Amino acid sequence: MFTVFLLVVLATTVVSFTSGRSTFRGRNAAAKASGLVSLTDRRPQCCSHPACNVDHPEICR
């Protein structure tokens, strides 16, 4: 009985760990996309500021 309990705990841990990682990747990608959209909205301010222009050359082309 104890062995079955340990197997259930292990299976639950593995499933929650792997699903948590994929969810984190999705949120991270969404956060990056959201950040790029907000930078694109501020294009004139960013492109005229040298430090921002160097950090984000993809929006100042």
Swiss-Prot record:
Residues 48-50 are annotated as: Ser-Xaa-Pro motif, crucial for potent interaction with nAChR. The keyword Transmembrane does not apply. Residues 21-42 form a propeptide. PROSITE patterns: ALPHA_CONOTOXIN (PS60014). Keywords: Acetylcholine receptor inhibiting toxin, Disulfide bond, G-protein coupled receptor impairing toxin, Hydroxylation, Neurotoxin, Postsynaptic neurotoxin, Secreted, Signal, Toxin. Residues 1-20 form the signal peptide. It is found in: Secreted. Expressed by the venom duct. Pfam families: Toxin_8. Its main location: secreted. It comes from the Eukaryota. GO terms for molecular function: acetylcholine receptor inhibitor activity; toxin activity. The modification 4-hydroxyproline is found at P44, P50. Belongs to the conotoxin A superfamily. The cysteine framework is I (CC-C-C). Alpha4/7 pattern. This is Alpha-conotoxin-like Tx1.2. It comes from Conus textile.
